[in-house]
């Protein structure tokens, strides 16, 4: 009777080991399949503008990736808010005035900064934080993320993250891919670093130095394309 009992224990142990091994194999296969199904295709963010101040068409691929990874491009069409965002790669002498206007009108904004901006305009970054604005990650060197490995992306993102935290005790949570270029892989990976991707639903050519200083044109473009829960992108590097 004792021999039979020992035999059953041995058989049961073997079965448990077998079942556990199969579970681990299946789990690994599922992880590999999931990782391999993430697209590496480079995408340049773009939108199709709508008329009558309606929300634009983000495009099916853009929308799917943003929704899947809980990013932000625009909000609920029934909410009358806008997201005001600025990309700050370098300082051209206009940010202080922009901050003054925002403060005067009690308007919060988000500024996406690079390491160069942090190192050369840290006083303005401090002012942004002190006045209640959000600071976002625009990476260390403003490189196109689809060109980078995950390890390189981690360095580009987290080196800046650490520098901002050490300098201001401020933890960034939002990232804007440099040049508006991304892939599903890069968005998925930056998610694992604790970041939400922020894109936009309105932009115009304010970055072109040859087209700057056109106040009437700028107002017309903005007012004609404003829509509920719009996400505006502009820069602090041109004369308005």
Roles of regions detected by a PLM:
Residues 2-85, 91-104:
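N-terminal pre-catalytic segment of deacetylase/amide-hydrolase enzymes
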Residues 92-93, 118-122, 147, 184, ...:
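Loop/helix-junction capping segments adjacent to catalytic residues or to phosphate/diphosphate-binding pockets
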Residues 94, 143-170, 181-228:
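Alpha-helical scaffold elements lining the catalytic groove of polysaccharide deacetylases
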Residues 82-85, 109-113, 134-137, 173-177, ...:
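Structural recognition of the beta-strand scaffold that forms the well-ordered cores
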Residues 69-70, 99, 122-126, 157-161, ...:
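Generic structural signal for well-ordered alpha-helices
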Residues 75, 98-106, 118-138, 190-192, ...:
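Acidic (Asp/Glu)-rich catalytic clusters
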Residues 84-85, 89, 113-114, 142-151, ...:
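Second-shell loop/turn segments in exported
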Residues 111, 128, 135-138, 153, ...:
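Hydrophobic packing within well-folded, soluble alpha/beta domains
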